[in-house]
Amino acid sequence: FLVFILMKGLIIWRLQRYSALLIFVYLVYVLSFFVKSQEISFFIWSDFFLSFHMRTLTSIIFIILLFHAFIGLWTVGTDYLTKRTLGFLNQSLIKYADLIRNLYFLCFGLIGFIYLTLILYIIWL
């Protein structure tokens, strides 16, 4: 939970914007491969993505993508899963707001870890 303590407004806002830019640059790089290639076959595509630099770059981008999603989901949880907002929906949810928010954080944390593990396994298989 140290991550939640370190997440301050301007810092996470900037990190999410910079991560979006890096993801965009990666997508432009991959799309430029398609544009520059005269003929794309499975072998050309696999040679491109199985090269060490593309595996490394793709791994880094997926870690950045996961971090980007984590910031977005954390923001949703802290903004909308509070006693005030849940109490607006139903008064009985007020006493469960902290539990609901923590379960939400746990769920997307576990899903993110599983996602990252599977992606890295697939990339480096």
Language-model region placement:
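Membrane-embedded alpha-helical bundles that constitute the cytochrome b-like, heme-associated redox core
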Residues: 2-125
